[in-house]
Regions:
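Acetyl-CoA-dependent GNAT
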Residues: 8, 24-84, 93-94, 99, ...
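A short beta-loop-alpha structural element at the N-terminal edge
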Residues: 1-14
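Conserved catalytic-core motifs of GNAT/GCN5-like acyltransferases
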Residues: 67, 109-113, 124, 129-146
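Short aromatic/hydrophobic contact patches that present stacked aromatics
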Residues: 2, 74-78, 109-111, 150-152
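Glycine-rich phosphate-binding loop
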Residues: 87
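Conserved GNAT acetyl-CoA-binding A-motif
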Residues: 100-112
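Conserved beta-strand edge residues that scaffold enzyme active sites
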Residues: 35, 57, 114-115, 137-138
Length: 155
């Protein structure tokens, strides 16, 4: 299992992972599927860093950070839920830390909807600490409002 920088060749596989997660519902604030063009713009152009984890030539997940204010990064992480690979998230985060630290900055923020139990557990396991709660910050397609939990990882 290796983590490396995302390339344009990875976009179809990563878009499929994202869109499958969106279709399952309840584990991301992303509610609408993305086209490959939208995904490439967001992850290859707007993201400061974006990596993939590859297992036997197959993309098993991706992770990136975007600017979130002075000295802060906002993280987004997705792993393939059709064929999960244990440890993929940890390998991605180790690579991301190695890429972020030389850039400087104070912290990485993870902004997770309160109904995303898996995401909350993942970021806690990676060492993120609870930082803020944004009440009723996100509305699900069925009209339910959920809090956003902000977790912080100091760099």
């Amino acid at each position: 299992m290796i983590a490396r920088a995302m390339t344009k060749e990875d976009v179809p596989a990563c878009t499929a992972i994202l869109n499958h997660t969106v279709a399952l519902g309840g584990s991301t604030a992303q509610e609408e599927p993305m086209t490959e063009e939208e995904f490439a713009q967001d992850h290859l152009v707007e993201a400061l860093i974006c990596n993939v984890v590859e297992v036997d030539g197959r993309i098993a997940g991706f992770q990136g950070v975007w600017p979130a204010g002075e000295g802060l990064y906002s993280i987004g992480s997705f792993t393939d839920r059709r064929e999960p690979v244990p440890g993929a998230g940890r390998v991605l985060f180790e690579k991301l830390l190695n890429d972020c630290r030389p850039r400087g900055g104070e912290a990485i923020l993870a902004k997770i909807t309160s109904d995303n139990i898996g995401g909350l557990a993942y970021y806690s396991k990676m060492g993120f600490a609870d930082f803020e709660i944004w009440p009723d910050d996100h509305q699900r397609p069925d009209g339910r409002k959920v809090d956003r939990i902000v977790k912080r990882f100091p760099l």
